[in-house]
């Protein structure tokens, strides 16, 4: 099992290109199941989760070709040969549930295993299922699988009110509704840029959608969808992660392809901590203003609030901030598993339920640490960049699910980082 060795060695300077959004691409890929015409995705990220979704779609009979080094995905679902998403593939990634709505909408039936992915709290799929039931689907959970069947004549438009904001449930319902008979209204829908990106792609395919980016999305079902070519939106989580690298280490880094509107609430916290963020012709330039970072309080919220997927990385920054910071996790349970590993590096962190109190120290110390999930893995790398001595991060297969060429991108800015094959 691979690990990553990081040596703390001062400031970072240079440019880092930001990839297409993993979470957007994982929703866009199943959209091919809605049509018998080709779907081409450009600016695709090159990640293990994308390969897993490719395997899943191919197991259903879809064709997926990776072109231009993986940055272009050519997909086609002319004739599906199977409507069963098996546990062996689905267990690797929670986004696998997103094939359910499209298959049900297009062909009227689907069998999908309950999903896997990062071990972060409960993260139930009941919101997905209730939305599909509102459209008339008959659902039966048995033997670890969701057996779904549409009513005669297909899914029907419905008013769906999500009791909690859910990105995945919004995506599943949005895709299913494009082929449902009549009008579907999604209320308390997720507002994330990935939802907007999916809606834009579906509209290119012929869907009739209004209101994406707001909490109410209206979809008028159509008889069929066509093909399209669509660029995947910039990954705001990768963007925020690499914005924190010069914030933690000092120096100045330009993030190519970055846009303020993708990370507005995050930028507000960086500004309060003493980090400068400026727009450039090609992206965003980030630098630490003067001296030590200042403590700030953070509460994770659905978009446009502070993203839960940047909480672990923000904690790494605040470990060496001047003063005491409070981080409140409002999205997922059990999402402070990186805290004990940061404590091994000398951080002062106390966790009580969904709240972590971080008292800044002058310097972290390198240590062997273990990644517990995707975002925790990169937070430990960031901490290692600013620590004295060497940090070895093990179990970095988590990292490969969400960050492409992380060692190459950071070393190009002066970081001492390399992968140790396991």
UniProtKB/Swiss-Prot annotation:
CDD domains per record: UdpNAET
Active site: 118 (proton donor)
Pathway: Cell wall biogenesis; peptidoglycan biosynthesis
A GO MF term: UDP-N-acetylglucosamine 1-carboxyvinyltransferase activity
Single GO BP term: UDP-N-acetylgalactosamine biosynthetic process
Principal cellular location given in the protein's record: cytoplasm
Residue positions binding phosphoenolpyruvate: 22-23
EC number per UniProt: 2.5.1.7
One Pfam family of this chain: EPSP_synthase
Enzyme class: transferase
Reactions catalysed according to its record: phosphoenolpyruvate + UDP-N-acetyl-alpha-D-glucosamine = UDP-N-acetyl-3-O-(1-carboxyvinyl)-alpha-D-glucosamine + phosphate
Family of this protein: Belongs to the EPSP synthase family. MurA subfamily.
NCBIfam families: murA (TIGR01072), PRK09369.1 (NF006873)
PANTHER family on file: UDP-N-ACETYLGLUCOSAMINE 1-CARBOXYVINYLTRANSFERASE (PTHR43783:SF1)
Record's protein name: UDP-N-acetylglucosamine 1-carboxyvinyltransferase
Organism annotation: Cereibacter sphaeroides (strain ATCC 17029 / ATH 2.4.9) (Rhodobacter sphaeroides)
Lineage, uppermost ranks: Bacteria, Pseudomonadati, Pseudomonadota, Alphaproteobacteria, Rhodobacterales
